[in-house]
Amino acid sequence: MKIRLLKPLLIVGVLLMIWQMVATLGSFPHYIFPSPQAVRQQLFTHAELLWQHTQVTLLEICLGLLLGFLFGLISALLLSFSRQISAVLLPILVISQAIPVFAIAPLLVLWFGYGMASKIVMSVLIIYFPVTAACYDGLRNTPQAWLDLAKTFNISPLRLLLKVRLPAALPAFASGLRIAVSVAPIGAVVGEWVGSSEGLGYLMIHANARMQVDLMFAALLILVSISLCLYFSIDWLLHRFIWSV
């Protein structure tokens, strides 16, 4: 356990050393590439401001993650339950991916406003298709021996889905959840970049416009920390409390 904790701390320490060396030896102006000390000072000086924007972004990420995974899981269940539904819904899902989600970010702000709703929708759209694909793939690849055994009991398609396909697809669901956790922050922050008045993405744009690059780095550092904490927390929960995948 101690070794597992030591490795990430060692990696962080090495990255901080490289950052400090580049900032010191690279002769970059402080307003182009701030040192770790300057960023740390901003973290303490603007702690209240950073916490205020962090709460907004964290809520957007969590709601987008929850809704995106839920919609993706429901869609995968519908696709696997009925061939008729799959024949109609699957082409629509594939065609929808031809439209870059980032390209419609301004439209989402126009439709849903500058508040939290447009950022949550952005996160949901980014999460939805990868989660649907991962969960659907898991539901389709049920071991044939399980299916053959289920047929001997003449169970209904619904019971086959719930009792056989669903348990067999649990590792795929875990993979889908990990994907969702990885990409959820992207949607929230891109939405804040396009149009917002709060959140870490907004704070980064605001600080960049005023050449407060050290504050922008502080916001970025918090965002990276949130992403890593969410991912490793979900990964630990999946291994510790649910199943080992």
Swiss-Prot record:
Major subcellular site: membrane
SUPFAM superfamilies associated with the record: MetI-like
Occurrences of domain ABC transmembrane type-1 (ranges): 50-234
Family annotation (InterPro entries): MetI-like (IPR000515), MetI-like_sf (IPR035906)
The UniProt record lists the keyword Calcium: no
PROSITE patterns: ABC_TM1 (PS50928)
Family, per entry: Belongs to the binding-protein-dependent transport system permease family. CysTW subfamily.
Protein name per the record: Probable ABC transporter permease protein HI_0355
Organism this protein belongs to: Haemophilus influenzae (strain ATCC 51907 / DSM 11121 / KW20 / Rd)
